[in-house]
Amino acid sequence: MPWPGRGHINPMLNLCKSLVRRDPNLTVTFVVTEEWLGFIGSDPKPNRIHFATLPNIIPSELVRANDFIAFIDAVLTRLEEPFEQLLDRLNSPPTAIIADTYIIWAVRVGTKRNIPVASFWTTSATILSLFINSDLLASHGHFPIEPSESKLDEIVDYIPGLSPTRLSDLQILHGYSHQVFNIFKKSFGELYKAKYLLFPSAYELEPKAIDFFTSKFDFPVYSTGPLIPLEELSVGNENRELDYFKWLDEQPESSVLYISQGSFLSVSEAQMEEIVVGVREAGVKFFWVARGGELKLKEALEGSLGVVVSWCDQLRVLCHAAIGGFWTHCGYNSTLEGICSGVPLLTFPVFWDQFLNAKMIVEEWRVGMGIERKKQMELLIVSDEIKELVKRFMDGESEEGKEMRRRTCDLSEICRGAVAKGGSSDANIDAFIKDITKIV
């Protein structure tokens, strides 16, 4: 049972694919709304993953960003009953329920029916530690805070698994994100009643945070990722005939900046105008995915050195030899896709966990660069700053650029090793399967 959103459904589906590929006796019932079945129902998947639907009684994916708080409330209050009805219709009760951590009621449903629940947290273990330890933040006077407070330069150095971090980098603690956090805080309480905790990360990316959870909970904690379907890239090359791949094939190696601001919340119109001017004036080749504003963006970028598309196969594009950098909103899926593809990341976070992901990319893993706001909580990053950063980021001949690309390749190898035979995540997925199949 994933949270109904692209950044949650994708890693959950990739986890389920990994499970059924390993055990021929496993069958997965993957629960989505009728609307989401329309989005993903035709995507390739193993035969032993079956979709089951809940009615469209929550706001549409197409408008949920208009009132995200109302969308969250709908998921948390309207879907529990139809989910239970779906369980009643199954031929036999499931061996286990894997539910997104944000689905607060899933653990309650499993407990009532004596079905063990594995809580699947779809972003970094580090930010979950921040959430779980919000009382520590409060005791230090760091939660909640207002963006204007002078203490934003103070350092948070007491959260397990989180390296010393400026309060201003934890934007989840104030403003709109604070409202969202207060709603989800209940789900972190339910987490203690789960039977397993799963992460989409590799242990090697976040050892301190994952060690914290392993010691904190008296149930198994498994890092299972990166849950990036690299094995699917060798199957079906029909996409090579698409015009955008033909364009990429014509570009020099590592010369193109891939730009994607994600599939949900994006930047303001004023900020987008600054980004457009900055990228255009940087004079680099670019491949820009614009969900919803393709025509307008094409007009604004007419005569520049790139292409604009409304959609692309992101992982295949990132793995193309022409791609030399990835401008990203820092959603965790995209972050892991970039790292696994060996592509440096240019961070432009917008919301929620993305700011902390950006910090880890730039400061901890050192596989990218980010905009440095000259003023705390600066709302608009101007085109001149963007232009200079893009030029610096795409300069593969500078010592800084060479080092960043070397580190990215090294981290890519580490992540691929985690999911390879005998790797840390490979072993964890095997252990999880043994756990849930022992229950039968």
UniProtKB/Swiss-Prot annotation:
CDD domains: GT1_Gtf-like. InterPro entries: UDP_glucos_trans (IPR002213). GO terms for molecular function: UDP-glycosyltransferase activity. The gene is UGT87A1. SUPFAM superfamilies: UDP-Glycosyltransferase/glycogen phosphorylase. PANTHER family: FLAVONOL 3-O-GLUCOSYLTRANSFERASE UGT76E12-RELATED, GLUCOSYL/GLUCURONOSYL TRANSFERASES. This is UDP-glycosyltransferase 87A1. It holds the Pfam family UDPGT. The keyword Hydrolase does not apply. Gene3D superfamilies: Glycogen Phosphorylase B. It comes from Arabidopsis thaliana (Mouse-ear cress). Belongs to the UDP-glycosyltransferase family. UDP-alpha-D-glucose binds at residues 263, 312-314, 329-337, 351-354.
